[in-house]
Regions:
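Active/ligand-binding-proximal structured segments within catalytic/core domains
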Residues: 46-61
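Basic polyanion-binding and macromolecular-assembly surfaces
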Residues: 1-48, 65, 69-72, 81-385
Length: 385
């Protein structure tokens, strides 16, 4: 079984500089991406402003940190600082979290137990994944969230990309100290590229695997050594390689308490709601905070397999998502279940085709409805009332 949530949004964004890349002289350039767009009977290539999935993930995880701390959910020291190196620097673990370092570096601790220790330590690494390069082994966890690039919707492909002139001046300070060739000039001229567009991006969440280890295939260090208490219960492959014995365990036997898994699933959805409502991603917010307005969105909660929503590039993306889910139901039968949710601001996204799908006019209500169904199904899966 599994419970999944997939989201796509259309965001009207004006005058944003969320994702800068390398400067060109005194010009701070906006990230760009090359896309293929169908035009009549052919395809055309366009270069458009973009915001990377990494920038979105960073903002997403920052919000998760703040909510987790407020709710008493464990967060490691570096994630709390917004440094998402995910225990990827062993020297930092050794100095900042000695108890964790002892577990991760121990040859007597199995790989699943090492991963579980990290999950207990930090909800952000549980949800966002990590790669910890230890001396003898790499501990890897794939992210439970998947994030796309944020791109202009291709239905109209209307966007603006401008270079804005800026001056930073400290004329009184310069006059006070006097000016010479080797001293700073009284003003600094620079340019910032900003963009405006109806953007769209997609986020997928694997709710069932939050709080559950993923390293279920591992080896003991010696043929002659006794199996650990957990490995005695494991399903053994019976294959030996050198002095190693390969073993498999049931991943769900190594997981957090069910109520903690639900809390973290709720945290993940709530953090996404704050990100979408407020646009807390990228940089330049101190002087270039974007005019950010979510204008429509669709969510699909499914079980037991994931169905990714149709991206918000076209005005009938909600209807296409509904048709996709209906098709899966016809194909897979009673084993497959889904619920679809829609948000729509009619004034800001005119001409959107939602078909016969019911929609919420308030984005907060949209997220409440999604969370209610997702957590209901997750609790059913975990055997909670």
């Amino acid at each position: 079984m599994g419970v999944y949530a997939s989201f796509s949004f259309r965001i009207l964004t004006n005058a944003e500089a969320l994702n800068a890349v390398e400067p060109l002289g005194n010009i701070i350039r906006h990230r760009r991406a090359t896309i293929i767009v169908p035009k009549n009977d052919r395809h055309e290539v366009f270069t458009v402003p973009a915001v990377s999935g990494e920038a979105i993930r960073h903002g997403y995880q920052l919000i998760m940190v703040k909510l987790a701390k407020a709710r008493g959910i464990n967060v490691c020291k570096l994630c709390e600082l917004g440094e998402f190196v995910k225990h990827g620097v062993p020297v930092l673990i050794e100095n900042l979290e000695k108890d964790l370092h002892e577990v991760l570096s121990s040859k007597d601790t199995s790989l699943p137990d090492k991963e579980l220790k990290v999950l207990e330590t930090c909800a952000i690494e549980d949800v966002g994944g990590f790669l910890i390069p230890m001396e003898d082994i790499q501990i890897k966890r794939t992210s439970r969230i998947e994030v796309s690039y944020m791109l202009p919707a291709i239905d109209d492909l209307k966007f603006g990309l401008d270079t804005q002139f800026h001056v930073r001046s400290a004329s009184q300070s310069q006059q006070a100290i006097g000016r010479s060739r080797d001293q700073a000039q009284p003003q600094s001229i620079y340019y910032v590229e900003s963009a405006s567009a109806v953007y769209t991006f997609t986020i997928n969440i694997n709710l069932s695997e939050i709080g559950v280890v993923s390293n279920c295939l591992y080896s003991t260090t010696s043929e002659d050594s006794e199996s650990s208490p957990d490995s005695k219960k494991a399903e053994k492959s019976g294959k030996k390689s050198g002095n190693k014995r390969i073993e498999i365990i049931d991943c769900k036997s190594k997981s957090l308490a069910t109520d903690e898994r639900v809390r973290r699933a709720e945290l993940t959805i709530d953090a996404l709601a704050e990100l979408v409502k407020n646009g807390l991603i990228g940089g330049h917010h101190s002087s270039y905070s974007p005019h950010w307005q979510p204008i429509s969105g669709v969510a699909l909660v499914t079980r037991p397999i994931q169905t990714v929503v149709y991206p918000g590039h076209v005005r009938n993306y909600v209807q296409k998502t509904a048709n996709l889910a209906k098709g899966n139901k016809e194909l897979l039968g009673d084993m497959y279940n889904y619920e679809i949710f829609t948000y729509w601001d009619k004034k800001l996204d005119p001409g959107l085709d939602v078909g016969d799908v019911k929609y919420a006019e308030d984005i907060t209500q949209f997220f409440k409805d999604v969370k209610s169904k997702a957590l209901e199904w997750l609790k059913e899966e975990l055997g909670m009332k």
